[in-house]
Design a protein with these regions (language model features):
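Hydrophobic ligand-binding cavity/cleft-lining segments
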Residues: 1-59
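N-proximal short alpha-helices
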Residues: 4-8, 14-17, 64, 125-133
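Conserved beta-strand segments that form the floor/walls of ligand-binding pockets within enzyme
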Residues: 17, 23, 80, 113, ...
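Glycine-rich portal/gate segments that line the openings of hydrophobic small-molecule binding cavities
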Residues: 23, 42, 52-109, 119, ...
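Beta-strand elements of well-folded, non-transmembrane domains
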Residues: 26, 70-72, 130-134
Length: 172
């Protein structure tokens, strides 16, 4: 498993980028199916419930809501899938989904990619290209918030890898 691969520095468009990865002992199609099972993300993303609100959840134009919080206290992250690609059978391209965060708190692009490393191994890459809220306050606060945000996402990725591996080995 790897640690955050970017320093949260501005991307060329002024967004803040955060990329985290985790290696999973399961084939790429298995990992892809698990990370894009939107309703199951609450199993591995702390205090988050995700639901599909439009479309099939596996194509451009589909919409999702993710509520992160405890009880009624939290925030709603609304998203639209803007890119969806899966490699053709026999090819080795990545599985990739890009969502546009359209909510009041989280804005920007989120990217999920699964890359095959071997027949029973893959790498899941989660990138956020964030438009920080609150203008200058958000830009000033990002270096303070980023380490905790990255640690939380990395914990979620490790849990996802464990759960995905367990499911895969139980079905073999």
């Amino acid at each position: 498993m790897s640690e955050p691969s970017t320093g949260g520095t501005p991307a060329p468009d002024g967004r803040r980028e955060l990329t985290l990865t985790v290696d999973v002992r399961a084939p790429a199609p298995v990992v892809w199916a698990y990370v894009t099972d939107w309703e199951a993300q609450g199993e591995w993303i702390p205090a988050t419930r995700v639901r599909r609100t439009g479309g099939d959840g596996r194509s451009v134009g589909s919409t999702l809501d993710a509520f992160t919080g405890v009880g009624p206290v939290g925030f709603l992250d609304t998203m639209e899938i803007t890119e969806w690609s899966e490699p053709a059978p026999g090819s080795d391209g990545p599985w990739r989904c890009v969502v546009l965060h359209t909510g009041k708190v989280v804005r920007g692009d989120g990217v999920f990619e699964v890359v095959e490393l071997g027949p029973q191994r893959s790498r899941f890459v989660w990138t956020e290209l964030l438009d920080l809220p609150l203008g200058a306050v958000g830009r000033f606060g990002w270096p303070l918030v980023r380490p905790g945000f990255a640690a939380g996402v990395q914990l979620a990725l490790r849990k996802m890898a464990r759960l995905c591996e367990r499911r895969y080995t139980a079905r073999r």
